[in-house]
Amino acid sequence: MNKKSLPLMALRDMVVFPGVIAPIFVGRKKSLQALSRTTISEENNSKYILVTLQKKFDQENPSKHELYNTAILAKIIQIVKLPNNTAKILIEAVARVKLSNIKDEEAFEANYEIIPDEEILDIHNMRSLVDNAVQLFSKYAMNDKKVNAEIIETINKEISNRTNFINIINILSSHLITSLETKQQLLEETNPVKRITTVITTLTSNIVNSETEHALQQRVRKQIEKTQRDYYLHEQMKAIQKELDEDKSELADIEKKIKSLKLSKEAKEKAESEFKKLRAMNQMSAESGVTRNYLETLLSLPWGKYDNSKIDINQAEKILNRDHFGLEKVKERIIEYLAVLQRSSKIRGPILCLIGPPGVGKTSLVKSIAEGMGRKYTKFSLGGVRDEAEIRGHRKTYLGSMPGKILGQLKKIKTSNPVMLLDEIDKMSSDFRGDPASALLEVLDPEQNSHFVDHYLEVEYDLSNVVFIATANSHDLPRALSDRMEKIYISGYVEEEKLQIAKNYLVPKQFKMHKIKEDEITISEAAILDLIRYYTKESGVRALEREICALTRKALKQILANKTVKHISIDSNNLEEFLGAKKYNFGLAEKEDQIGSTTGLAYTEVGGELLTIEALAFSGKGEIKTTGKLGDVMKESAMAAYSCFRSRATNFGLKYDNYKDFDIHIHVPAGAIPKDGPSAGCALFTTIVSLMTKIPVHRTVAMTGEITLRGNVLPIGGLKEKLLAASRGGIKTVLIPEENVKDLKDIPPNIKENLEIISVSNIDQVLKHALVEMPINKGLSYDL
């Protein structure tokens, strides 16, 4: 053939080798165009076409750069047109060719040049390699039933000639189970020895994989047969046991427990009734399993089992002081509680509820109380509980039913008088499954919990000997539940307390945990102070402990990595080398006095926070807008502050002339954090006055307190936490409601020394201390 250019067809999923006849389904537009452009050769009255593999399988319309240059010159033996504008062709690969000058138009077209195979120099060696490959292929064909018998027959016919090694290699290559890339490499390889070597390697791998798969199938089949055999024998054993009445031994154990346990009268009658039903049932029935589970649960509870606890308030006080620094008032109330129990265990004291921010030691206090009482400790976390069945249990008629967590904890620790922590009691919620807070009322009421009935047991269980202690972060508890508990407030730690806790508790704890020797690492007091000030911002010490843990890990890594380092000393100078840049600013208030910007004080679940309140005025309709994700209470405080300002505008030298011509926008930054509460009135009022009179607010002054429309300042809560936040934030003066002066006795002396605390009773006093100067009555209208 003298043609130098032919239509070119791209193949998705096959590589054709010379001498091989292969069917091809044609459906893509370019491929059909290429097929239609084939012409009959003058030499042998046949049609020819070029075929090559595309580089990416999922390419619907590959470009000429996405085709391999080594292709096949193929003779078209047959064309069969199919429905949906597709066709099936049968081709015979004539020769391997090198493509050039590929044209990418409606159809591919390319020039070609035939690539001959290299000469076989060692015929004897080649014959050995081919024989080896054919034997391997025969073995593979025996293992893999997918190989067509006609292929084996074709190979055997070629082998009989013993001369056309190239044809044998091509046939074997076309039927290898390997990647398209590997087959393309085989096509491109002109050295017959290298090609047959690759074929042998691939066939060997295929045989190993086939044998492994076959062995795995055999193993799975044997396992299935064994499982079926075991099941059959197990069922036979059950039938034999039924005939021999061997189940009687298990029933006898249940009956023995019913008689020996100190069950209540009601529980014993219920157990005997259920046992009679169980004995009369078919032991293979589903109802039998339900009854058996019920009896096992009922009899596994610690009926009449109590720890011999002996309360010694002196020892309890030592334990509390050993495990906790500070918290004097809290410890005092706990000792009073234990003193009452020591004198008379029959007195039903109140349920304690420890309320405070995270990390202040609520959970560890409860553990210390349990140790001081000589009782076991157990914990029931209520965070996220929204199903009352978690408390009361599910009725046994339900599939997979079980008792509630209260009895579940007693079953676990095997005593009826533990100290039980009800953790995160403020995090419960209710939905269509009921209200768990209402279910807790019976548990926490001393008049009712001696007759607690779990839905699963359906008999009374005495919880009056359990010491329940709850913890919460927020005061926001259901009224009925709150009424049954005595709330003990645990405020955040001051800097000095955190320092002592870190030195005496946290650092030794981390050194012990990480197996640090005393002479390996030292952390200076200055470094701990910097940790508290610049790497944590919390009321508790949980984050401080994490930072100390990170510090210990990094120092230990240096010691182990560098054998010459025997001791590491950490102080404020090299602290950043271990923990990186400082995370927070400490003692930095605003740099300048601002107009329309005031610092308020907030009390959140995690302690006190500084709250910046800012405002702007602009042309509008006389409306007031609030942003910053404010709650309803805070929005109403803003409205009240604005109304109070309007009523006193003439006192500040402003007229009523143009209020309807502008809007006031009040914003509290950190808009992603919800903010609410009745203590921002003073700050809101001061912000508005500063904005309208253009008088700056002292940058070192913060304030807290709600106001009335008449300008009176109302008391607030969380005073200690707010003063701690002011001290951390570099505030010098704090304005507090006059009615909160009585709470100053609970404030640590060092906080009161660092702050100038001024009590105020009305907004005039607030403005006197907050503004740079008092507004003068000039009788002017506000000018934008």
Swiss-Prot record:
Q: Where does ATP bind?
A: G356, P357, P358, G359, V360, G361, K362, T363
Q: What is the originating organism of this protein?
A: Rickettsia prowazekii (strain Madrid E)
Q: What induces it?
A: By heat shock.
Tell me where it resides: Cytoplasm
Q: Which family does it belong to?
A: Belongs to the peptidase S16 family.
Q: How does it assemble?
A: Homohexamer. Organized in a ring with a central cavity.
Give the Lon proteolytic domain ranges. 592-773
Task: Tell me which residues this entry annotates as catalytic.
Answer: S679, K722
What chemistry does it catalyse, as a reaction equation?
Hydrolysis of proteins in presence of ATP
Query: What EC number(s) are associated with this protein in UniProt?
Result: 3.4.21.53
GO cellular component, as recorded: cytoplasm
Query: What PROSITE patterns does the database record attribute to this sequence?
Result: LON_N, LON_PROTEOLYTIC, LON_SER
* Pfam families attached to this UniProt entry: AAA, Lon_C, Lon_lid, LON_substr_bdg
Briefly, what is this protein's role? ATP-dependent serine protease that mediates the selective degradation of mutant and abnormal proteins as well as certain short-lived regulatory proteins. Required for cellular homeostasis and for survival from DNA damage and developmental changes induced by stress. Degrades polypeptides processively to yield small peptide fragments that are 5 to 10 amino acids long. Binds to DNA in a double-stranded, site-specific manner.
Q: Which InterPro entries match?
A: AAA+_ATPase, ATPase_AAA_core, Lon_bac, Lon_bac/euk-typ, Lon_lid, Lon_proteolytic, Lon_Prtase, Lon_prtase_N
Listed A to Z, the keywords are: ATP-binding, Cytoplasm, Hydrolase, Nucleotide-binding, Protease, Serine protease, Stress response
Q: Which gene encodes it?
A: lon
What GO molecular function annotation could you give as one example from this UniProt entry? sequence-specific DNA binding
Gene Ontology terms describing biological process: cellular response to heat; protein quality control for misfolded or incompletely synthesized proteins
Start and end residues of each Lon N-terminal domain? 6-207
Its predominant location is cytoplasm
The protein here is known as: Lon protease
